[in-house]
Amino acid sequence: MARVGACLLACLMSAGAFAASGQQLYGTCAACHGARAEGNPGLGAPALAGQHVAYLQRQLLNFRSGLRGSHKDDTYGAQMRAGSQATLPDEKAIAAVATYIAALPRTEVKPAGKFDARNGNNLYQGKCGACHGGQAEGNEALSAPRLAGLDAAYIKRQHRNFGKGLRGAQPQDRYGRQMALMATTLASERDLDDVIGHIHAAGAAR
């Protein structure tokens, strides 16, 4: 019995150290992404709080390896690539900071300005919802990130990056390549605005 208790205590101490490590590592990220990972559109930094752990880990690994952020025209991606390489030395560090971020309270964004709710809903459900969820909550089983909570400028920038080959162009980036194909199906700026409005409205309604 004493041995079981000692093992349990050791596990709890290990979990506590892991969480503390994630929080400490996030300190560098907070300068751009905010103290609670709420994001900062003025710096081009998206909200990260409440995002799926596996997605966060994959993107950080992609930045470190150059699958993301290596295109000469991807300025913000290059910043993230340099930052992740400088502050996250290995996969254990990436797992710790991703776990910490995912546990933070989610950020919601209210729709800004007018948008065609019907068109946004129809387009989102027809093109995005099957993977990203009916309310933009994401789907870990499909490796599709949560979109609710991401600011409009970030979503537009990533849509453009996928469409122009700045992201998702490398053969090894399986999920990025899927999104690069999907980005071509939403070509109109008005349609994109309507979809983003729907994403924000759906996220706020949850």
Label each region the model flagged.
Residues 26-29, 45, 53, 77, ...:
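Disulfide-stabilized extracellular ectodomain repeats and their linkers
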Residues 119-169, 181:
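A charged, solvent-exposed segment within the mature domains of Sec-exported extracytoplasmic proteins
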Residues 22, 27-65:
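The feature marks the first
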Residues 40-47, 64-94, 110-115, 140-146, ...:
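Axial heme c-ligation environment in periplasmic c-type cytochrome domains
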Residues 98-122, 206:
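Intrinsic disorder/low-complexity detector
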Residues 18-38, 112-137:
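Sequence/structural segment immediately N-terminal to covalent heme-attachment motifs in c-type
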Residues 5-16:
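Bacterial N-terminal signal peptides
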